[in-house]
C-alpha cells in the first residue's frame, strides 16, 4: 500500500509536469495524488482494483475495455502505474497494466517513460509531430 510521502511526491510531480486543464491518471491505490496535484482523473476508475479483479468485466463501460475507452476519450497528460500496491493478494497495478496487451499498446503508442517518483512507472504524453 502507498505511503503518504509517495502519494505526496506523485501529486507534486503531476502538478509540475501538467497544466491545470489536463487530466492525469493513476492506475493503483493512490488517488490522493489527484488532490495534491489539483488535477482531474482521466477515468472513473480512480483506483485499479475493480479493473484488475474483473468487476463487471464484459458489461459496457467496465473492465479493461471501459478503462481504455475512458483513457482514449480523456487523453491524460501523465499516466502513473503503481508498483507493489496489491501484491500478493492480486497482481500489482503496473504489472497488470503492462501485461494487458490493449492497455500496454495504448500507452506505448502515445506516451514515453519518464523518471518519476519511486514506486511508480510514470509515462508522459508524447508531443504531437509539428
Can you describe what each PLM-predicted range is?
Residues 1-129:
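Extracytoplasmic
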Amino acid at each position: 500500500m502507498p505511503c503518504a510521502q509517495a502519494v505526496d511526491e506523485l501529486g507534486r510531480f503531476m502538478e509540475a509536469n501538467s497544466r491545470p486543464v489536463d487530466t492525469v491518471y493513476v492506475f493503483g491505490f493512490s488517488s490522493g495524488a489527484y488532490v495534491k496535484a489539483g488535477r482531474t482523473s482521466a477515468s472513473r476508475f480512480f483506483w485499479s482494483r475493480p479493473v484488475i479483479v474483473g468487476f463487471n468485466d464484459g458489461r459496457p463501460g467496465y473492465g479493461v475495455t471501459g478503462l481504455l475507452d475512458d483513457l482514449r476519450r480523456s487523453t491524460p497528460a501523465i499516466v502513473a502505474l503503481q508498483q507493489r500496491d496489491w501484491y500478493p493478494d492480486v497482481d500489482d497495478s503496473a504489472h497488470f497494466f503492462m501485461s494487458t496487451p490493449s492497455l500496454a499498446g495504448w500507452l506505448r503508442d502515445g506516451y514515453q517513460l519518464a523518471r518519476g517518483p519511486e514506486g511508480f512507472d510514470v509515462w508522459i504524453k508524447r508531443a504531437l509531430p509539428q
